[in-house]
């Protein structure tokens, strides 16, 4: 078992960290945990989202005829998570933090902290995401390029709307604590 943490803020540094894991440590899977803003009304602060897939909501080559989110030159721009890891993570969540809602859905990533309703609605309507954050899709892309199963796990810290900055500070610690409980159980099951 190898756990790695990256405090880098930009998506390319996350890809590099994932590539290092693939190249030098020959990892069997990549599991990334963190926090995110909810894009759905039924997903509340403290709940957990397990990625079914991930994509970059701020990739925009529409001037060249691409759909929003499509990465030019890539055959795939939506990266599918491992069903086996999703199943194991769901069981670990329900066992370790049964009081939380556990959702399976799309994680969308972009180089921005979403904190207004208009941006939230645009991202939700265009990309059908369950939550938004900054690095999951970059990690998923690197895992895909290396043919490594992956899972992105996000504890919800805010509602990605006008209250996001206030919610984030208040709920960040709780969201992280829930992620740690679940991750410990998941690693034990793998």
Predicted regions and their residues:
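His/Asp/Glu-rich mid-to-C-terminal helical/loop segments that flank catalytic regions of hydrolases
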Residues: 160-190
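Short, well-structured alpha-helical segments in soluble
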Residues: 17-25
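Mid-sequence, gly/pro-rich, charge-dense loop/helix-turn segments that line enzyme active sites
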Residues: 39-127
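A C-terminal functional module that forms or caps the active site or interfaces directly
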Residues: 112-159, 165
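Single conserved hydrophobic/aromatic residue that forms the stacking wall/gate
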Residues: 1-8, 12
